[in-house]
Amino acid sequence: MKNIHYYIVTLVVLLFMVAPAKAASEAEFGKLHKTYILHTDGSQEMRVQKELTLFTHTAMNRLYGESFIVYNPEFQELKIHESYTRQKDGNIVKTPENAFVEVLPSAAADAPAYNGLKEMVVVHTGLELGATIYLDYSVITLPGYLPELDVCEQIEELTPIREYVLSVSVPENKPLHYELLSGKTVPVVKTAGGVKTVTWALKNVQPRPNMIQVSLPAGNVQAIVASTYASKADALKVIKRQFESNDKEVSELAKKLTANAQSPEQKMKQLTAYVQGLGNCRLSLSQTGYRLRPAAEVIRSAYGTEAEKAALLAALQQASGIQAEVKAVFPKTEDKDAAGLAAVSRLFVTDNAIADMQDFVSVVNMDAQPVVLETVSHVISQTDTLRVTAKTGKTLEAGYRRFELPQAQSGWAVYEGRSTTMNTTRPVNLLLRYLPDETYTCIVKVVDGMKPVVLPTDKKIDNPVGTVEVTVKKTAKEIKIVRTLKLKKQLITPAEYPAYYRLMSEWMDTGKSVLFFNLSSAVL
């Protein structure tokens, strides 16, 4: 008995020892400072200073063993002010010259037009558990390369940040729009020596979840946006003026691609398929300096950035007599002009996924006018017939036969319902891609005198997130089983998540329903 008591006490102690370790972070930023400066001559500087302490081998070998800096050496200069590692015993290991490795950014691979870009890989040396990485660098941009100072910085990292500071400095006569998204920290604004500086300082920033998708539209991460564009319309003019109209090569291609099309819908489908078939260059707008190549060059090279392909698709459709325009997706802001081009998450012509999410983002045309997108119906109404006979189904003992309700080949349960309920609780908001409205009816035809033994039962769960309902109606020769799912809330908070989880658990269970019939009185 004493031995049992000893083992129980030992187990409890071990559990208390393991629990905190399991919850510990891989690393911690002691300091993460970012500074953006616009000088009077139009040149810009972005400076990053970070101190990062490593706690695990994962942090050391996978997450933070290297730092990556993308820049354009034709217009930008990279300056490494400081790079070293302070080991646990205080020993300093400076980053050697051969640990600064310059490569082509992976996003520019197979895109010769952007092969001038560079990515500096800083390989941190002297790493060990408890070591702290120190890195301080600047990217200095020549006047004229970037149209304006334009900032969009997500704050949360995969590890905690004890001290986060972001400051923006511009000549005091320049317009400056700025905003903190999904946060409450008020910036400090100072003007001295003809320079206006806006600074946000945050303490003890909690990490974003590692295995859970987070986003600005869901409101579960903070971000700072700032720009010196006079307005959002002025920002979009930078993109719009690069669009071409009546390009001969575009017109000829549009005519060729739609030669056999019988309707505008067929034309749109064929043009869209062509553009989607072009190679994808994953560089962002900011990485290309907010520049787009001419449509003719995109055609000849057979690849393009997202922005270039959107511009080409709009041009092809316009050349085919179809009304089309490029649209931009921004985060929602209280100051409509706070978000500049750095905050654009998508440029597109048509996109059903964005249409489903448009209540949580700002969608505008190239004149910065709000656009309401047409949505695609997600209503599913499916009817199947299941024949129950003395010879169908799976034979069981004692004269029973087992039947399974037909499984949905599409719909919420196939992927979304499972991928959004991996855990019973959720620490951050969940933004669903769309609101499902699904009804599955199964008509069970009963012959040969088969008698039902086990059937689904009537059930209805109705909560603030949505409704799951199952109804069963029996007659002499058939049974009608109706399963219904209808969600009401697209943005689900952590407090509402248990209600969503319960609905999904029930919905998954109804989708796997089995029926049992007895053969004892059946005609064999």
Regions found by a protein language model. Give the residues of each.
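Bacterial N-terminal signal peptides that target proteins for export
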Residues: 1-9
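Bacterial N-terminal signal peptides
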Residues: 9-17
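A sensor for short, sequence-defined functional sites
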Residues: 23-524
